[in-house]
Protein backbone atom coordinates (compact mmCIF):
# COMPACT_ATOMS: atom_id res chain seq x y z
CA UNK A 1 0.00 0.00 0.00
CA UNK A 2 1.74 3.10 -1.29
CA UNK A 3 1.13 6.49 0.34
CA UNK A 4 4.42 7.92 -0.92
CA UNK A 5 3.19 9.70 -4.03
CA UNK A 6 4.37 8.46 -7.44
CA UNK A 7 7.96 7.26 -6.79
CA UNK A 8 7.11 3.65 -5.74
CA UNK A 9 5.02 3.25 -8.90
CA UNK A 10 8.22 2.56 -10.84
CA UNK A 11 8.43 -0.81 -9.06
CA UNK A 12 4.86 -1.85 -9.81
CA UNK A 13 5.78 -3.46 -13.15
CA UNK A 14 8.65 -5.41 -11.57
CA UNK A 15 6.72 -7.19 -8.82
CA UNK A 16 3.81 -9.61 -8.66
CA UNK A 17 2.47 -8.17 -5.43
CA UNK A 18 -0.63 -6.05 -6.07
CA UNK A 19 -0.12 -2.36 -5.31
CA UNK A 20 -2.62 0.17 -4.01
CA UNK A 21 -1.65 3.83 -4.29
CA UNK A 22 -3.62 6.38 -2.29
CA UNK A 23 -3.37 9.77 -3.96
CA UNK A 24 -3.50 12.51 -1.32
CA UNK A 25 -4.12 15.34 -3.75
CA UNK A 26 -2.08 16.51 -6.74
CA UNK A 27 0.82 18.84 -6.04
CA UNK A 28 1.06 19.70 -9.73
CA UNK A 29 -0.56 18.78 -13.05
CA UNK A 30 2.93 17.85 -14.24
CA UNK A 31 2.95 14.63 -12.20
CA UNK A 32 -0.20 13.33 -13.93
CA UNK A 33 1.69 11.69 -16.85
CA UNK A 34 3.55 9.55 -14.30
CA UNK A 35 0.31 8.36 -12.71
CA UNK A 36 -1.15 7.74 -16.17
CA UNK A 37 1.84 5.60 -17.14
CA UNK A 38 1.06 3.16 -14.32
CA UNK A 39 -2.72 3.16 -14.71
CA UNK A 40 -2.79 -0.60 -15.33
CA UNK A 41 -0.31 -1.74 -12.69
CA UNK A 42 -1.25 0.31 -9.64
CA UNK A 43 -4.71 0.50 -8.17
CA UNK A 44 -5.47 4.14 -7.37
CA UNK A 45 -7.52 5.20 -4.38
CA UNK A 46 -8.80 8.77 -3.97
CA UNK A 47 -9.44 10.46 -0.61
CA UNK A 48 -12.60 12.06 -2.01
CA UNK A 49 -14.59 11.73 -5.21
CA UNK A 50 -13.97 15.39 -6.00
CA UNK A 51 -10.20 14.84 -6.00
CA UNK A 52 -10.27 12.27 -8.80
CA UNK A 53 -8.71 13.01 -12.18
CA UNK A 54 -10.63 11.83 -15.23
CA UNK A 55 -7.54 10.31 -16.86
CA UNK A 56 -6.82 7.86 -14.02
CA UNK A 57 -8.38 4.50 -13.20
CA UNK A 58 -9.56 4.33 -9.59
CA UNK A 59 -10.26 1.25 -7.54
CA UNK A 60 -12.24 3.15 -4.93
CA UNK A 61 -12.55 6.23 -2.73
CA UNK A 62 -11.59 5.84 0.93
CA UNK A 63 -12.09 8.86 3.16
CA UNK A 64 -9.47 9.80 5.73
CA UNK A 65 -10.22 8.43 9.17
CA UNK A 66 -9.62 9.99 12.58
CA UNK A 67 -9.37 8.57 16.08
CA UNK A 68 -12.76 9.63 17.40
CA UNK A 69 -11.59 9.27 21.02
CA UNK A 70 -9.34 12.29 20.48
CA UNK A 71 -12.42 14.51 20.16
CA UNK A 72 -14.96 14.76 22.96
CA UNK A 73 -18.54 15.87 22.44
CA UNK A 74 -19.67 19.30 23.66
CA UNK A 75 -23.42 19.78 23.80
CA UNK A 76 -23.57 23.40 24.97
CA UNK A 77 -21.28 25.74 23.03
CA UNK A 78 -20.09 29.22 23.93
CA UNK A 79 -20.99 32.32 21.94
CA UNK A 80 -18.24 32.45 19.29
CA UNK A 81 -17.37 31.25 15.81
CA UNK A 82 -14.09 29.54 14.98
CA UNK A 83 -11.68 29.69 12.05
CA UNK A 84 -9.18 26.85 12.36
CA UNK A 85 -6.47 26.38 9.77
CA UNK A 86 -3.48 27.85 7.99
CA UNK A 87 -3.51 31.64 7.72
CA UNK A 88 -3.49 31.79 3.94
CA UNK A 89 -5.76 33.40 1.31
CA UNK A 90 -6.84 29.97 0.00
CA UNK A 91 -8.17 29.06 3.44
CA UNK A 92 -10.36 32.17 3.62
CA UNK A 93 -9.24 33.78 6.87
CA UNK A 94 -10.29 37.24 5.69
CA UNK A 95 -13.66 35.92 4.51
CA UNK A 96 -14.22 34.36 7.94
CA UNK A 97 -13.62 37.78 9.49
CA UNK A 98 -16.12 39.36 7.09
CA UNK A 99 -18.70 36.72 7.96
CA UNK A 100 -18.26 37.24 11.70
CA UNK A 101 -18.48 41.02 11.41
CA UNK A 102 -21.60 40.92 9.24
CA UNK A 103 -23.21 38.38 11.58
CA UNK A 104 -22.14 40.44 14.62
CA UNK A 105 -20.42 37.41 16.16
CA UNK A 106 -17.13 36.96 17.97
CA UNK A 107 -14.54 35.06 15.93
CA UNK A 108 -11.54 33.15 17.24
CA UNK A 109 -8.81 32.47 14.66
CA UNK A 110 -6.39 29.62 15.34
CA UNK A 111 -3.63 28.37 13.07
CA UNK A 112 -0.10 28.80 11.84
CA UNK A 113 0.77 31.87 9.78
CA UNK A 114 1.70 30.41 6.41
CA UNK A 115 1.52 33.67 4.46
CA UNK A 116 3.09 36.43 6.57
CA UNK A 117 2.33 39.24 4.12
CA UNK A 118 -1.34 38.22 4.06
CA UNK A 119 -1.47 38.08 7.85
CA UNK A 120 0.23 41.41 8.55
CA UNK A 121 -1.47 43.33 5.71
CA UNK A 122 -4.97 41.83 5.73
CA UNK A 123 -5.62 40.00 8.99
CA UNK A 124 -3.75 41.76 11.80
CA UNK A 125 -5.40 45.17 11.14
CA UNK A 126 -8.80 43.49 11.68
CA UNK A 127 -7.96 42.07 15.12
CA UNK A 128 -9.98 43.41 18.05
CA UNK A 129 -12.03 42.22 21.00
CA UNK A 130 -14.46 40.79 18.44
CA UNK A 131 -11.82 39.20 16.18
CA UNK A 132 -9.20 37.31 18.22
CA UNK A 133 -6.10 35.52 16.95
CA UNK A 134 -4.73 32.85 19.31
CA UNK A 135 -1.96 31.41 17.11
CA UNK A 136 -1.26 27.74 16.53
CA UNK A 137 -3.20 25.38 18.79
CA UNK A 138 -1.95 22.14 20.33
CA UNK A 139 -4.26 19.08 20.38
CA UNK A 140 -5.83 19.97 23.74
CA UNK A 141 -6.42 23.59 22.73
CA UNK A 142 -7.83 22.45 19.39
CA UNK A 143 -10.32 20.14 21.07
CA UNK A 144 -11.45 22.89 23.44
CA UNK A 145 -11.70 25.58 20.75
CA UNK A 146 -13.65 23.34 18.40
CA UNK A 147 -15.96 21.85 21.00
CA UNK A 148 -16.97 25.19 22.49
CA UNK A 149 -17.59 26.98 19.18
CA UNK A 150 -21.08 27.63 17.86
CA UNK A 151 -19.83 26.81 14.38
CA UNK A 152 -16.64 26.35 12.39
CA UNK A 153 -16.20 28.70 9.42
CA UNK A 154 -14.40 27.13 6.45
CA UNK A 155 -14.68 29.63 3.56
CA UNK A 156 -12.08 28.09 1.26
CA UNK A 157 -11.34 29.40 -2.23
CA UNK A 158 -9.72 26.24 -3.65
CA UNK A 159 -10.79 22.69 -4.48
CA UNK A 160 -9.75 21.14 -1.18
CA UNK A 161 -9.22 17.35 -1.48
CA UNK A 162 -10.35 16.69 2.10
CA UNK A 163 -11.02 19.03 5.02
CA UNK A 164 -9.64 17.48 8.22
CA UNK A 165 -10.63 20.44 10.40
CA UNK A 166 -14.20 20.13 9.14
CA UNK A 167 -14.39 16.51 10.29
CA UNK A 168 -12.61 17.29 13.57
CA UNK A 169 -15.15 20.00 14.29
CA UNK A 170 -18.08 17.70 13.62
CA UNK A 171 -16.56 15.02 15.87
CA UNK A 172 -16.79 17.60 18.68
CA UNK A 173 -20.44 18.13 17.80
CA UNK A 174 -19.80 21.53 16.25
CA UNK A 175 -21.61 22.25 12.95
CA UNK A 176 -19.71 23.75 10.04
CA UNK A 177 -20.39 26.52 7.55
CA UNK A 178 -18.34 25.84 4.44
CA UNK A 179 -17.94 27.27 0.98
CA UNK A 180 -19.23 24.74 -1.54
CA UNK A 181 -15.95 23.72 -3.14
CA UNK A 182 -13.89 20.56 -3.59
CA UNK A 183 -14.77 17.75 -1.21
CA UNK A 184 -17.08 19.85 0.99
CA UNK A 185 -20.35 18.39 -0.41
CA UNK A 186 -19.03 14.93 0.52
CA UNK A 187 -18.35 15.97 4.11
CA UNK A 188 -21.33 18.21 4.80
CA UNK A 189 -24.99 17.32 4.43
CA UNK A 190 -26.70 20.67 4.05
CA UNK A 191 -28.92 21.53 6.99
CA UNK A 192 -28.02 18.33 8.87
CA UNK A 193 -24.44 18.67 10.10
CA UNK A 194 -23.76 22.12 8.70
CA UNK A 195 -24.37 24.37 5.73
CA UNK A 196 -22.92 24.62 2.22
CA UNK A 197 -22.85 28.20 0.94
CA UNK A 198 -21.38 30.05 -2.02
CA UNK A 199 -20.25 33.33 -0.50
CA UNK A 200 -19.93 35.52 2.59
CA UNK A 201 -23.53 36.70 2.51
CA UNK A 202 -24.76 33.12 2.23
CA UNK A 203 -22.75 32.20 5.31
CA UNK A 204 -24.16 35.14 7.27
CA UNK A 205 -27.68 34.07 6.35
CA UNK A 206 -27.34 30.41 7.42
CA UNK A 207 -25.74 31.39 10.73
CA UNK A 208 -29.20 32.62 11.71
CA UNK A 209 -30.27 28.96 11.63
CA UNK A 210 -27.17 27.36 13.15
CA UNK A 211 -29.13 26.55 16.32
CA UNK A 212 -31.32 24.16 14.29
CA UNK A 213 -28.39 21.80 13.75
CA UNK A 214 -28.35 18.98 16.32
CA UNK A 215 -24.81 18.73 17.63
CA UNK A 216 -25.23 15.07 18.56
CA UNK A 217 -26.03 14.26 14.93
CA UNK A 218 -22.89 16.09 13.79
CA UNK A 219 -20.76 13.72 15.85
CA UNK A 220 -22.71 10.60 14.93
CA UNK A 221 -22.44 11.31 11.21
CA UNK A 222 -18.72 12.04 11.47
CA UNK A 223 -18.10 8.79 13.34
CA UNK A 224 -20.07 6.75 10.80
CA UNK A 225 -18.14 8.10 7.79
CA UNK A 226 -14.77 9.35 9.01
CA UNK A 227 -13.55 7.18 11.89
CA UNK A 228 -10.21 5.37 11.75
CA UNK A 229 -12.14 2.10 12.07
CA UNK A 230 -14.25 2.92 9.00
CA UNK A 231 -11.14 3.81 6.99
CA UNK A 232 -9.34 0.61 8.04
CA UNK A 233 -12.40 -1.49 7.21
CA UNK A 234 -12.70 0.07 3.76
CA UNK A 235 -9.02 -0.56 3.00
CA UNK A 236 -9.24 -4.13 4.28
CA UNK A 237 -12.07 -4.79 1.82
CA UNK A 238 -9.89 -3.45 -1.00
CA UNK A 239 -7.00 -5.70 0.04
CA UNK A 240 -9.34 -8.71 -0.03
CA UNK A 241 -10.70 -7.64 -3.40
CA UNK A 242 -7.20 -7.52 -4.91
CA UNK A 243 -5.89 -10.71 -3.30
CA UNK A 244 -8.84 -12.92 -4.13
CA UNK A 245 -10.05 -11.62 -7.46
Where are the predicted features?
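Catalytic cores of nucleotide-sugar-dependent glycosyltransferases that transfer UDP/GDP/TDP-activated
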Residues: 1-245
Amino acid sequence: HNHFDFLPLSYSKLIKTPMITTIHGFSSERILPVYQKYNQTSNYVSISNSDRHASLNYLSTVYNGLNVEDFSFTGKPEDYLLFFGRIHPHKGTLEAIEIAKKANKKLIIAGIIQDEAYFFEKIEPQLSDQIEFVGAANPEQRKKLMGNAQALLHPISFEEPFGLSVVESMLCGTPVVVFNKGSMPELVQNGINGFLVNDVDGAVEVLKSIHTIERKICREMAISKFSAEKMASDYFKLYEQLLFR
